Amino acid sequence: MSKKYCYLFTEGNANMRELLGGKGANLAEMTNIGLPVPQGFTITTEACTQYYADGRQINDEITADIFEHVKGLEKITGKTFGDNENPLLVSVRSGARQSMPGMMDTILNLGLNDEAVEGLAKKTNNARFAYDCYRRFVQMFADVVMMVPKSLFEVEIDKMKEADRKSTRLNSSHNRESRMPSSA
């Protein structure tokens, strides 16, 4: 039998901190006591250890377990990851065995793209919300994965707000324009 690298929140508990990390164990415990926690799963600390043992490569066994759990989330939520009409959005949060406040990065709204954001806007009947989610995803991904400074996005957003002094809130057209910073 292959090793289990992912656990649904419903499968874990607070005593599994070494395996699930602090956040994973706490999310599992909150789920177990009935608090309203979005459906999700935790990739184990053993998967991280294996990743480093494999030369910073995610092996096929870990990949298969992750895909299996994404499919499980799709079944539970009725949404589909990467779907343009009813997208499943996930948050990626790192969590160590020991608490390290401010040291770990987060990416929200993974699953959005240029087409899926339109589906989210239609599904929620709220284009501003959908494009704000997408902007946040692109900004976090650019910062965490691509190491693009947050300040580049903030400068562009401030320029848009200045050009449209009617509101300090970004509307959906601003968010469409702010997906990527200009190269200027």
Give names to the regions the model predicted.
Residues 1-169, 176:
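N-terminal beta-alpha lobe that positions the nucleotide/phosphoryl donor
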Residues 170-184:
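Single conserved hydrophobic/aromatic residue that forms the stacking wall/gate
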